[in-house]
Amino acid sequence: MSIDRRSVLRGAAGVSAAGLLSYAGMAPAGARARARTTATADWMASQADSTALTRLTIPGTHDSGARFGGLWVQCQSWTIAQQLAAGIRFLDIRCRVTGGSYAIHHGAFFQNLMFGDVLIACRDFLAAHPSETVLMRVKQEYSEVGDAEFRAVFDDYLDRRGWRSLFHIGDSWPALGAARGKVVLMADNGGLPGGIRWGDSNLFAIQDDYNAEPFGKWPKVRDHFRRAAASPGPQYINFVSTAAGLPPDWNADRLNPQTRDFLNSGEAAGLTGLGIVPMDFPDAVSGLLGAVLAHNPAR
């Protein structure tokens, strides 16, 4: 059985907990404590300025602002600031155009967060940790304005609201030294500036099968890690998250431990440059972020 993500987001409030608990016996029995990670806030400081971003292994979050909306909608428990402090360096930011601004949404659900709030969190973090960079995907969500209007709002943030100096907006991947202290824009909208276009096959190799059933998703994640190790070049992005069959939290209960255990396995020992690894609820599994970060070049 596969559940369409858009239908899920429209109907999330009407799903009964009893019905969910019957699905394949995979639901957690009760509330669980979330383990804080030990990832450092300055992990990029150990990497040389000449390091290509594509040769790093970068923890990220899927739908980074999605903390509200209920079981089928929430993808994160950490705030943006908490994610960055824990070692997350890729943010997946979904923006609805409303009133000349970007409101952060997951489907129809406003996340009590505006784009300016996200930028403030990034600015404050990077000011305190100048060795770091943040890679940010910006995507339109739950609005259907044209590219020109979406761009006009983004330009307003850059210029009238004074955020241009925070961004690195380029046509190709910068080396880490050029990106330190900056937000590197990954444009997932035709109107956004710069040449790092989300999905450009010359720049990216993306695994994001969000409709894969939980048992079918893991082989896709594992095989994309193997491809990244065997064929370096583009920016690999390997979404651990899936929206099929179960709520994001429950899928993360299965996929996050599998990811940690693979990265800690003998097969993965010594591999570097595994790309960006966006996850739901990365705080749920002790040692997960450390396992991702361990696959960066030693210096």
Which functions belong to the PLM regions below?
Residues 55-58, 89-93, 134-138, 183-187, ...:
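Structural recognition of the beta-strand scaffold that forms the well-ordered cores
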Residues 1-19:
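N-terminal secretory signal peptides and thylakoid transit peptides that target proteins
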